[in-house]
Structures are given as structure tokens and as C-alpha cells.
Curated annotation (Swiss-Prot):
Catalysed reactions, semicolon-separated: L-aspartate + H(+) = beta-alanine + CO2
Protein name: Aspartate 1-decarboxylase
PANTHER family the record matches: ASPARTATE 1-DECARBOXYLASE
Post-translational modification: Is synthesized initially as an inactive proenzyme, which is activated by self-cleavage at a specific serine bond to produce a beta-subunit with a hydroxyl group at its C-terminus and an alpha-subunit with a pyruvoyl group at its N-terminus.
Native species: Microcystis aeruginosa (strain NIES-843 / IAM M-2473)
Length: 139
């Protein structure tokens, strides 16, 4: 039946604190934020800039409290104050998702990149092995 790529973590509405074109690449993200949603250092992420519509993929470095810093080429796509959504995905066997479900952790940030809201989005198996129900619950 194959595999399916599902979101497992999302940082919603984080703000760029700085952009460093001279750094080696990546995006530096507040360590507490990535740990809260389960993103690992060096994990690939997709980034959507809500302030200008640009999108890019990169990898994560852990940073200091409040830090959201696109580095290298990604720094050319953002400027301080821009609002971003950062997604991380995992590849799962489709049948396993239908049988056991899936959940993703979502953190909504305030203007200082602190957790404003935290919740889980889940796929819950229907029991017939062919479908799932979607659920979203605040933690």
C-alpha cells in the first residue's frame, strides 16, 4: 500500500528575530520550541513566510530563547519581524496510519516566540482499517 508523508510538528506564527546570510545555512529555532513539538536538530523542515508568501526547505539548528533566525540563502527570503509557519514531516506506512492512527504537535507562538497555544491534531482509526477521523485537542 506504500507510505504517506504526514506532518508531525508545526510551529505556527513564529516571528523572525534576525536573518543571517553569512551563516552556513539552516534555520536556528528556539530550543524549547523545537523540543516541545518534537523537531530534532538537523531535521528537515518546510518554512512558509506569511509576510511575503515565499517558501523554502532547510534544516534546524537549536537556538536561544525567542530565536528564529533563517541562515544562508534562507536569510534572503525573510527579514526580522516576518511571520513564519514551520512544518516537519515523517514518512509512515499508510496501512499503519489507518490501523494505529497518527498525531502531530502544534504550537502557536505569540509576538515574542513564546508558546501561546499548544495542541495535538490526530488521525484516529475508524476500526475498519480503511479510514480515519480527524481530531484537534488542546493540551
Amino acid at each position: 500500500m506504500g507510505t504517506i508523508r504526514l506532518m508531525h510538528a508545526k510551529l505556527h506564527r513564529v516571528r523572525v528575530s534576525e536573518a543571517n546570510v553569512d551563516y552556513v545555512g539552516s534555520i536556528t529555532i528556539d530550543r524549547e520550541l523545537i523540543e516541545r513539538v518534537g523537531i530534532l536538530p538537523l531535521e528537515e523542515v518546510d518554512v512558509v513566510n506569511l509576510s511575503n508568501g515565499k517558501r523554502f526547505s532547510t534544516y534546524v539548528f537549536p537556538g536561544h530563547t525567542g530565536e528564529i533566525c533563517p541562515n544562508g540563502g534562507a536569510a534572503l527570503l525573510c527579514q526580522p519581524g516576518d511571520i513564519l509557519i514551520i512544518y516537519a514531516y515523517e514518512q509512515r506506512p499508510r496501512q499503519e496510519v489507518l490501523e494505529k492512527g497518527h498525531f502531530a504537535k502544534v504550537l502557536v507562538a505569540d509576538a515574542e516566540n513564546r508558546c501561546q497555544q499548544f495542541f495535538e491534531q490526530s488521525l484516529i482509526p475508524r476500526g475498519d482499517g480503511r479510514g480515519v477521523e480527524f481530531s484537534s485537542q488542546e493540551c
